[in-house]
Regions:
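Globin-like tetrapyrrole-binding proteins
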Residues: 1-155
């Protein structure tokens, strides 16, 4: 799958100007929609966690033209997430919440094409992280609903 790098870069440049708002929305929505993930962050500084996640997003966008660099880094990130007790079923929760955060922060710039670009990018990120964590990618699929892109757990 060829990612729409130009659209990912341009839309993320708008997000970078609203980092705090984006991250606050992301985590408050994640915990509201999926309270079962909150214990994974029990011993975590949420301020540091938000900074780290945003740095990871910046890294991904800045390296979209370097697939080898991204592949290695995202597989390693998937491996590290094992020690945080992250399970395959958590990936769709994060993906859905990221897409919501993008839609809120991008507002009118969140077009069907932008949504598709980020959905496809997250699918690639998930596939690489799961392969690093040695989970089979077949457990997840990206499914298009009428107005909403949702990652669904097939188990």
């Amino acid at each position: 799958m060829a990612l729409n790098i130009e659209l990912l870069e341009s839309s993320f440049s708008e997000i970078k100007a609203h980092e705090a708002e984006f991250m606050n929305y992301f985590y408050s929505t994640l915990f509201a929609d999926y309270p079962q993930v909150k214990p994974l962050f029990a011993n975590t500084s949420m301020k540091k966690q938000a900074k780290q996640l945003f740095k990871s997003l910046v890294f991904v966008v800045e390296n979209l033209h370097c697939p080898d660099v991204l592949t290695e880094a995202l597989k390693a990130l998937g491996t590290r997430h094992i020690q945080y007790s992250v399970q395959p079923e958590h990936y769709p929760m994060v993906g859905s919440t990221l897409l919501k955060a993008f839609s809120i922060c991008l507002d009118s710039a969140w077009t069907p094409n932008t949504k598709q670009a980020w959905s496809e990018a997250y699918a690639v990120i998930t596939e690489l992280m799961l392969s690093g964590a040695e989970y089979p990618i077949e457990i997840l699929t990206l499914q298009q609903d009428d107005d909403q892109t949702v990652l669904r757990d097939l188990n």
